[in-house]
């Protein structure tokens, strides 16, 4: 893996504020992925929006200090997004979310031209760039983190333009998953795993080259239209699960872009997650 791959991370960012600790950490799905790509040895950029408050300056400075290209961050009048977080038994629990200036974020022509110069673009369900995906996907592959928002309308809107699709399957999203599953008219299956696989097959046929479902402590499942893949987790001490999913995505994409197959890329994702959950905060 000696080729310097270049990944454009686009969309939301937020300050993760731990109320009980009175500590704040810069983060957000695409921001985290950009930082992890750098940690793995690649090149990355982040395109998004921050406010004119102190958190905006902290966000830009923190990303720059990790070596990520911040030349296309928009500074908009207002407040930077904040997510309130707490730690309960090693797991993060989300509280109030304040969107701030992200509500006004939109890609400009110069941003799209910049993004197209990368090897891959990665964004997510809160990235607000689904309207630009047809343009971007004509030039470079797109990775999209749909998180556990199975029934969100953005899923159907974005999926045809996505090369690598990621979903997160957990107890919290079980009802939403079943709602989406039945709305698609898919066959009843004997258990959740079989239903998830049926869903993944249906989604993969809508456009993605590969679809991955992360299962928390149960590892991940992958499907490429021909074969199924499964990988567990790398055992490690859990300090904070913040960034675990984003670490997996970054590790997987870094592996794929450097020529690894799906199975080995899933292992690379798990290894990267194990590093991240061993310390406080996403990075």
Question: Which residue stretches match the model-derived regions?
Answer:
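Structural motif
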Residues: 6, 119-120, 164, 210
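Short, hydrophobic/glycine-enriched beta-strand segments
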Residues: 6-12, 143
